[in-house]
From Swiss-Prot:
3-phosphoshikimate binds at residues 21-22, 26, 167, 169, 315, 342. It comes from Alkalilimnicola ehrlichii (strain ATCC BAA-1101 / DSM 17681 / MLHE-1). CDD domains: EPSP_synthase. Phosphoenolpyruvate binds at residues 21, 94, 122, 169, 346, 388. The keyword Nuclease does not apply. Its main location: cytoplasm. It catalyses: 3-phosphoshikimate + phosphoenolpyruvate = 5-O-(1-carboxyvinyl)-3-phosphoshikimate + phosphate. This is 3-phosphoshikimate 1-carboxyvinyltransferase. The active site is at 315 (proton acceptor). Monomer. One of its GO terms (cellular component) is cytoplasm. The keyword Cytoplasm applies. Catalyzes the transfer of the enolpyruvyl moiety of phosphoenolpyruvate (PEP) to the 5-hydroxyl of shikimate-3-phosphate (S3P) to produce enolpyruvyl shikimate-3-phosphate and inorganic phosphate. GO terms for molecular function: 3-phosphoshikimate 1-carboxyvinyltransferase activity.
Length: 446
């Protein structure tokens, strides 16, 4: 599938983007391991979160839904999962694979985890090694990639682990394994990362001890089911934050956005660049801060992005590169080598696409240097099957002089089902077409 985007167009209106992907994954996982019923609203019905849902159904968990974002999970307790009939296919979801490695390490049965071609290239050694230190046995493909087989029946013991690279997925995998481990499991981060696992464990009644950048749990506790309201995903909102910032005449409000302080780096970086973002109607829902974000177009300036903000915006850099491309002056990103091992090499792929559009974008080993300009041409860019790349270049068209065609966009549904329709409602002139360029569906501004 391809996206064809006509240039220009202000973004206007009130929008609610789909539910948070990170929270949706964890709601299913913890709800399945809890005792009693868990009722979820706002669940993200994207391919990644649905892969997690199917996985727990395959392990004997009764799950009703999703029905318009509502899911009911009948928990089986920490030791109630059953062996699946065959390998568990996680599609494109790295979150599912890494977190399940920790969770499945404490089960009594063997499980094989597989994924698509992109996921099968992503590094898993970073989670396999510390889990092995806890007593887990995990077999991988050459180079520590999927498919992975997690051997059951292994006695786990707690460890005190210092993450060499900030990673919420690795931290979460170790904490989930720690539920089954003898003694205490502690993880120390070099920099703050998203803390949904810690917050949600506590919300399910499991004691969690936080000491600065060190988080600890004791094995042998219990989880209690309850209610979870999943806020809108700030990573999905980011495309509209940037689109409205760079498209002249824009004024949009994004509703019920999750504002977890470990996720708001994109707002902080855009404000450093001069973006006009107002945080309104702040409140707390289910232990997570939530707000409405009003965004109006504003002239942006290039900045040196503080490395302390990198882990807090790691998924948003593709669209932040688009913001940098139309900012006055130079933007420099360093300390973001993690971008090279996402669904694609996001540094190389974004530099390639921006260069195609006529932007000066110089990839660095751990980041990028971008020289902004008032507008740019169009052209044909390749997303390499990366959902965030495809959506980032969609927003780039709001400042282009000519149409932009984006190849290989089917994976947008992994995180943002309904993106084409919502972007059209906001004012983006976006057409979805097949590989031969034939239009299939049009979502134009009025």
């Amino acid at each position: 599938m391809e996206f064809h985007v006509r240039p220009g167009g202000a973004l206007r209106g009130r929008l609610r983007v789909p539910g948070d992907k990170s929270i949706s994954h964890r709601a299913i996982m913890l709800g399945a391991l809890a005792e009693g019923e868990t009722r979820i609203s706002g669940f993200l019905e994207g391919a990644d979160a649905l892969a997690t849902l199917r996985t727990f159904r395959a392990m004997g968990v009764d799950i009703d839904g999703p029905h318009q974002g509502r899911v009911t999970v009948q928990g089986v307790g920490l030791h109630g999962l059953r062996a699946p009939d065959g390998p568990l296919d996680l599609g494109n979801s790295g979150t599912s694979m890494r977190l399940l490695c920790g969770l499945l390490a404490g089960q009594s049965f063997d499980t094989t985890l597989t994924g698509d071609a992109s996921l099968s290239r992503r590094p898993m050694r970073r989670v396999i090694d510390p889990l092995t230190a806890m007593g887990a046995v995990i077999e991988s493909g050459q180079g520590g990639t999927a498919p992975l087989t997690v051997r059951g029946g292994q006695p786990l013991h707690g460890i005190d682990y210092e993450l060499p690279v900030a990673s919420a997925q690795v931290k979460s995998a170790l904490l989930l394994a720690g539920l089954y481990a003898r003694g205490r499991t502690c993880v120390t981060e070099p920099a703050p990362t998203r803390d949904h696992t810690e917050r949600m464990l506590a919300g399910f009644g499991y004691p969690v001890r936080q000491e600065g950048r060190r988080v600890c749990i004791e094995g042998g506790g219990r989880l209690r089911g309850g209610e979870i309201d999943v806020p809108a995903d700030i990573s999905s909102a980011a495309f509209f934050l940037v689109g409205a910032s760079i498209a002249e005449g824009s004024d949009i409000t994004l509703e019920h956005v999750g504002m977890n302080p470990t996720r708001t780096g994109v707002v902080d970086i855009l404000r450093l660049m001069g973006a006009d973002i107002q945080v309104q109607n702040e409140r707390e829902v289910g232990g997570e801060p939530v707000a409405d974000l009003r965004v109006r177009s504003a002239p942006l300036k290039g900045v040196a992005i503080p490395e302390a903000l990198v882990p807090l915006a790691i998924d948003e850099f593709p669209v932040l590169f688009v913001a940098a491309a139309c900012a006055e002056g130079e933007t420099l990103l360093t300390g973001a080598e993690e971008l090279r091992v996402k669904e694609s090499d996001r540094i190389a792929v974004m530099a390639e696409g921006l260069t195609t559009l006529g932007v000066t974008a110089e990839p660095q080993p751990d980041g990028m240097r971008i020289v902004g300009q008032p507008d740019w041409g169009g052209g044909r860019v390749h997303s390499h099957g990366d959902h965030r790349i495809a959506m980032a270049f969609t927003m780039a068209a709001t400042r282009a002089r000519e149409p932009i065609e984006i190849e290989d966009c089917a994976n947008v549904n992994t995180s943002f089902p309904g993106f084409v329709e919502l972007a059209g409602d906001a004012g983006v002139a976006l057409t979805r077409g097949d590989a031969e360029g034939r239009a299939q569906q049009r979502s134009d501004s009025p």
